[in-house]
């Protein structure tokens, strides 16, 4: 047994070590949370850009597909005579200098011999010598060609199906380039008008940017390939248009999320777990959206200012402040559901359910910067349940 003084000193030492570990643990958890938020912000930003790019690509793909379908229908009517003509030629005309794709026979198991050397009469006074590497390379090529039976028919001519595929691909590519050139010439004056309108565009509210971007996309939707056509216009303000689209997309997502939260209604038929998970999921999405916007604000704010794009909506006095305030509705629904469960099931009063409700309320309180009168009243009602149980 140690004296009481030594016991007290050991106890104090252990308490201090425990406190130090707790502080360190809190610090690590905070850093981990910040890293998760940063990763979520980057993923959201990438997702925003990908979604907008996919929308534009799908629109262009539909137009390309419709134009290709029309060209393939016309091309198929013209390709049959070509293939017949090529087959006929292959049977009537024989080239004295055989090629692997014309001289091959289906029954041959060995590659054909190399072409004979020309006679000395044709050589004149020039001196020549045999080159073994030419023979080896020729035999290697002919051996490889002999294994391509699926592409060569019995007469040694490429099959009509293979011909059609090759011709179809060439025609499609040629038509695509032709359509780009045609769009460049046809819409030249209209695109010059769009350039002047984009360069002169100024906005006082972010909702005006949404409308303007929608109009620009509609005006450019008739182009077979927007990027390919606009490359022919050096004065096209690409950076400003991209910034406008980015701002509209970054504003649209949190705005829609805020509307979803304001219209949220708890379904009494849902179980307690389902109801609380729905509310928690909305709050997680809300925090992620707000954090992403706040972190993006410093990097994009200056660029938006340069292009006269409204950026004040990213401040607490704008949309971000409205989103934080909308989280109070989630706190109200969460606490109401907890209180209802506690009142109907007394056994849960001393469990973790009350702590769960208070913890969520505290999280919203810190996120929104406080409670309004209605939310505070619901909190007091929840608090009374605990007080009543303690007195009982």
From Swiss-Prot:
GO terms for molecular function: microtubule binding. Keywords: Coiled coil, Cytoplasm, Cytoskeleton. GO terms for cellular component: chloroplast envelope; cortical microtubule. Residues 65-128 are annotated as: Disordered. It comes from the Eukaryota. Residues 65-76, 100-109 have a biased composition (Polar residues). Signal peptide: none annotated. Residues 11-52, 269-299 form a coiled coil. The keyword Cell inner membrane does not apply. The keyword Signal does not apply. Belongs to the IPGA1 family. Microtubule-associated protein probably involved in the regulation of microtubule organization. This is INCREASED PETAL GROWTH ANISOTROPY 1-like protein 1. The lineage of its organism: Eukaryota, Viridiplantae, Streptophyta, Embryophyta, Tracheophyta.
